[in-house]
Amino acid sequence: MIDLESRIEEMKSNLVSKNFRYIIKCKYKTIPAKEKDIYKEEKLKEYNYYVKLIKKLKKHIKNSSDIQFYTKYDKFNNLVCLVSKFDINEIDINLNIDIRIIIGDKYDTYMKTTYYQEKCGILYLEEFESGSRNNGYGSMLLDNLNFIIDNINNRLKNYNNYSETYNFKPIKILKGRAIPFKSVISQEDLNKLYTKYGFKIDNNNYLLKNRE
């Protein structure tokens, strides 16, 4: 019989400390429903949640050349991972940047963005999808977006410092278009959400936010 409590605390501790080595090597498996009578239901659910979260995070770490994540507690008191990742080797004119909240469930909250430069760095928000309705992850992502972008800017600055190939300008402007994921949020509610976090929205649902 597995000591679920100690394993849960072990996984949570290594997520909070951003222990990449642990996450890559972790091989815990979810416990199937047929064994649920052995364990308390809520503890089993929590254990399986963190096993799934680490598996998903591990996949992103393995598939990215530059990834950072931070943990937050959601409204269900579960740890979630706020992730930003990109592949510097795939840059052409623009750089694709993946920003998401990874949870120990099926669907992430996901923001597909593109970095490009004019007088300053600009981040264009192409897609913004939340995995399910009323879970608070869309608000969490937007609430932490400035922090995530500051981290991205620091990483881009490091590339400038270590290679003459790059001359990235810091991201100071956010642009994009508010396109709702119809099964989750309406256009009106999505616009209200963006407005709450400092975005200006025109009549065609185009977004603009200056970070200066």
Named regions from a protein language model:
Residues 134-145:
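Glycine-rich acyl-CoA binding loop
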Residues 137, 182-183:
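Residues that cap or flank secondary-structure elements
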